[in-house]
Amino acid sequence: IAYNPGSLDPQTASDDSSTLLIASLYTGLLRLEPDGSLSAGVAEDYTVSDDGLTYRFKLSSSNYWTDANGFDSVCTAQDFVFGFQRLFDPATRAPRASEYFCIKNSRAINSGAISDLSRLGVTASGNYELTIELEYPDPNFPMLLTEAPAMPCSEEYFISSQGRYGLSRDTTPSNGAFYLRTWNYDPYT
């Protein structure tokens, strides 16, 4: 890694060092394989409606959040709902939100025309079923689900980080293959 990441918050990260680390710390609904194919991430299976506007995901019950301080919680559909709500909330100022404007009501929420985040086309049915509704079909949408902005966000963990989510070892959770044990901020060591 050439330099310290600016943030390990998937919804706000924009630099190469951050997105490289996020790919190891977080697991999204789908994964991008080295050959360019998509495989299961947190989603064990998914279906797409005939019109290409509705994606339904069945999530694994064995994906957990962890961190260097012993945080342990199951990753649920609500974590994806909250992550997408943060992505489009104007207060977040997510630099890549526009890439996901195919999601129902996302553009209107991001612009402030709709203030009710629950109107976003991302909903949970219980802990392990997630539905994403689109405004228009987007053949690239499954690929977008492998990118940093589409990663889940534990609302409990986010609130407990008190505005420092993804900015230190102690405020960066993981639901991926690795978690952050140390973060050396000195570029000369």
Where do the model's predicted regions map?
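Gly/Pro-rich hinge or "lid" segments in bacterial periplasmic/extracellular proteins
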Residues: 117-119, 127-128, 133-189
